[in-house]
Protein backbone atom coordinates (compact mmCIF):
# COMPACT_ATOMS: atom_id res chain seq x y z
CA UNK A 1 0.00 0.00 0.00
CA UNK A 2 1.45 3.33 -1.07
CA UNK A 3 1.57 6.09 1.55
CA UNK A 4 1.75 9.68 0.37
CA UNK A 5 3.90 12.16 2.32
CA UNK A 6 2.99 15.76 3.03
CA UNK A 7 5.58 18.13 1.54
CA UNK A 8 5.07 21.33 3.55
CA UNK A 9 5.85 24.49 1.60
CA UNK A 10 6.58 27.83 3.27
CA UNK A 11 9.01 29.30 0.75
CA UNK A 12 7.56 29.32 -2.78
CA UNK A 13 4.20 30.14 -4.30
CA UNK A 14 1.11 30.96 -2.28
CA UNK A 15 -0.17 29.86 1.13
CA UNK A 16 -3.22 27.74 1.86
CA UNK A 17 -4.19 29.89 4.87
CA UNK A 18 -5.52 33.41 4.19
CA UNK A 19 -2.57 35.58 3.14
CA UNK A 20 -3.86 38.53 5.16
CA UNK A 21 -3.16 36.49 8.32
CA UNK A 22 0.46 35.81 7.32
CA UNK A 23 2.15 39.20 6.96
CA UNK A 24 5.52 37.87 8.13
CA UNK A 25 5.45 35.05 5.57
CA UNK A 26 3.99 36.69 2.46
CA UNK A 27 4.62 39.76 0.33
CA UNK A 28 2.11 42.34 -0.94
CA UNK A 29 0.97 39.91 -3.68
CA UNK A 30 0.27 37.22 -1.10
CA UNK A 31 3.19 35.00 -2.18
CA UNK A 32 5.70 33.52 0.24
CA UNK A 33 8.60 35.95 0.65
CA UNK A 34 11.13 34.11 2.85
CA UNK A 35 13.58 31.43 1.82
CA UNK A 36 15.31 28.95 4.13
CA UNK A 37 17.83 31.50 5.38
CA UNK A 38 15.12 34.15 5.88
CA UNK A 39 13.05 31.75 7.98
CA UNK A 40 16.13 30.74 9.97
CA UNK A 41 17.11 34.35 10.73
CA UNK A 42 13.60 35.61 11.50
CA UNK A 43 12.93 32.50 13.58
CA UNK A 44 15.81 33.45 15.86
CA UNK A 45 14.79 37.11 16.07
CA UNK A 46 12.61 39.20 18.37
CA UNK A 47 9.41 38.41 16.45
CA UNK A 48 9.84 34.64 16.78
CA UNK A 49 6.50 34.17 18.58
CA UNK A 50 4.54 36.03 15.90
CA UNK A 51 6.34 34.14 13.15
CA UNK A 52 5.73 30.82 14.92
CA UNK A 53 2.01 31.58 15.14
CA UNK A 54 1.83 32.34 11.43
CA UNK A 55 3.85 29.26 10.48
CA UNK A 56 1.64 27.12 12.71
CA UNK A 57 -1.46 28.59 11.05
CA UNK A 58 -0.13 27.82 7.56
CA UNK A 59 1.05 24.33 8.53
CA UNK A 60 -2.38 23.60 10.02
CA UNK A 61 -4.04 24.73 6.78
CA UNK A 62 -1.75 22.53 4.69
CA UNK A 63 -2.27 19.55 6.99
CA UNK A 64 -6.06 20.02 6.93
CA UNK A 65 -6.10 20.14 3.13
CA UNK A 66 -3.84 17.09 2.91
CA UNK A 67 -5.86 15.04 5.40
CA UNK A 68 -9.06 15.94 3.56
CA UNK A 69 -7.57 14.20 0.50
CA UNK A 70 -5.79 11.41 2.38
CA UNK A 71 -7.79 10.81 5.60
CA UNK A 72 -5.86 7.64 6.44
CA UNK A 73 -2.74 9.78 6.90
CA UNK A 74 -4.16 11.28 10.11
CA UNK A 75 -2.97 8.22 12.04
CA UNK A 76 0.47 8.15 10.42
CA UNK A 77 1.51 11.39 8.76
CA UNK A 78 4.77 11.35 6.79
CA UNK A 79 6.28 14.84 6.64
CA UNK A 80 9.07 16.75 4.96
CA UNK A 81 9.26 20.24 3.51
CA UNK A 82 10.41 22.30 0.59
CA UNK A 83 14.04 23.40 1.00
CA UNK A 84 14.13 21.39 4.26
CA UNK A 85 12.49 24.33 6.06
CA UNK A 86 11.06 21.96 8.70
CA UNK A 87 14.62 21.61 10.06
CA UNK A 88 14.48 25.24 11.24
CA UNK A 89 13.53 25.21 14.94
CA UNK A 90 10.64 27.69 14.67
CA UNK A 91 9.21 25.72 11.72
CA UNK A 92 9.77 22.31 13.33
CA UNK A 93 8.03 23.41 16.52
CA UNK A 94 5.12 25.06 14.69
CA UNK A 95 4.66 22.06 12.39
CA UNK A 96 4.66 19.65 15.34
CA UNK A 97 2.12 21.80 17.19
CA UNK A 98 -0.08 22.12 14.10
CA UNK A 99 -0.09 18.34 13.59
CA UNK A 100 -1.13 17.75 17.21
CA UNK A 101 -3.86 20.40 16.91
CA UNK A 102 -5.18 18.61 13.80
CA UNK A 103 -5.18 15.29 15.72
CA UNK A 104 -2.51 13.92 13.40
CA UNK A 105 0.24 11.59 14.54
CA UNK A 106 3.51 12.19 12.72
CA UNK A 107 4.88 8.71 12.07
CA UNK A 108 7.85 9.66 9.90
CA UNK A 109 9.72 12.91 9.40
CA UNK A 110 12.64 13.42 7.05
CA UNK A 111 15.71 14.58 8.93
CA UNK A 112 18.13 16.17 6.44
CA UNK A 113 21.30 15.04 8.19
CA UNK A 114 23.86 13.96 5.64
CA UNK A 115 27.06 12.14 6.52
CA UNK A 116 29.80 13.73 4.42
CA UNK A 117 32.11 10.89 5.42
CA UNK A 118 30.18 8.66 3.01
CA UNK A 119 31.34 10.85 0.12
CA UNK A 120 34.95 10.70 1.34
CA UNK A 121 34.74 6.92 1.57
CA UNK A 122 33.68 6.57 -2.07
CA UNK A 123 36.05 9.23 -3.41
CA UNK A 124 33.36 11.85 -4.14
CA UNK A 125 34.20 14.46 -1.47
CA UNK A 126 35.93 16.69 -4.04
CA UNK A 127 32.62 16.90 -5.96
CA UNK A 128 30.92 18.71 -3.08
CA UNK A 129 30.96 22.45 -3.67
CA UNK A 130 31.53 25.02 -0.95
CA UNK A 131 27.89 26.17 -0.88
CA UNK A 132 26.68 22.58 -0.52
CA UNK A 133 29.19 21.93 2.26
CA UNK A 134 27.81 24.97 4.09
CA UNK A 135 24.22 23.75 3.56
CA UNK A 136 25.16 20.33 4.92
CA UNK A 137 26.82 21.82 8.00
CA UNK A 138 23.77 23.99 8.76
CA UNK A 139 21.28 21.17 8.14
CA UNK A 140 23.34 18.69 10.16
CA UNK A 141 23.39 21.09 13.12
CA UNK A 142 19.63 21.68 12.90
CA UNK A 143 19.01 17.96 12.42
CA UNK A 144 20.52 17.14 15.81
CA UNK A 145 17.85 19.29 17.47
CA UNK A 146 15.15 17.69 15.31
CA UNK A 147 16.23 14.21 16.31
CA UNK A 148 16.09 15.16 20.01
CA UNK A 149 12.56 16.56 19.64
CA UNK A 150 10.85 14.11 17.31
CA UNK A 151 7.31 13.24 18.38
CA UNK A 152 7.02 9.95 20.25
CA UNK A 153 7.05 6.99 17.87
CA UNK A 154 8.18 9.09 14.92
CA UNK A 155 10.79 7.49 12.68
CA UNK A 156 13.40 9.10 10.47
CA UNK A 157 15.25 7.11 7.84
CA UNK A 158 18.62 7.71 6.21
CA UNK A 159 19.04 10.81 4.07
CA UNK A 160 21.25 12.02 1.25
CA UNK A 161 20.95 14.53 -1.54
CA UNK A 162 22.06 17.97 -0.39
CA UNK A 163 25.81 17.50 -0.81
CA UNK A 164 25.64 16.82 -4.53
CA UNK A 165 22.58 18.92 -5.36
CA UNK A 166 23.17 20.90 -8.49
CA UNK A 167 25.68 18.36 -9.77
CA UNK A 168 23.70 15.13 -10.03
CA UNK A 169 24.01 15.21 -13.82
CA UNK A 170 27.76 14.55 -13.44
CA UNK A 171 27.24 11.25 -11.62
Model segments located where?
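Surface-exposed loop/turn and secondary-structure junction residues enriched for glycine/proline
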Residues: 11-13, 25-28, 88-90, 167
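Short, flexible active-site-adjacent loop segments at beta-strand->alpha-helix junctions, enriched
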Residues: 8-10, 38, 85, 115
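Active-site gating loops and adjacent loop-to-helix segments of metal-dependent hydrolytic enzymes
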Residues: 15-49
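Active-site beta->alpha N-cap acidic-glycine motif
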Residues: 1-13
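Generic secondary-structure boundary/loop-capping signal
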Residues: 7, 22-23, 29, 156-159
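Catalytic domains of cell-wall/extracellular-matrix polysaccharide-remodeling enzymes
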Residues: 62-63, 67-154, 159, 164-169
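Cap/lid and interdomain-hinge subdomains that line or gate substrate/regulatory clefts
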Residues: 40-69
Amino acid sequence: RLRVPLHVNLVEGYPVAPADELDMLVDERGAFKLDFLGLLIKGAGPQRAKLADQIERECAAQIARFVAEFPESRSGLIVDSHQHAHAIPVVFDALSTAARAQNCRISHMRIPEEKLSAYRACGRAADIGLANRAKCLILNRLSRRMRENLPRGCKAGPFCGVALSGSMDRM
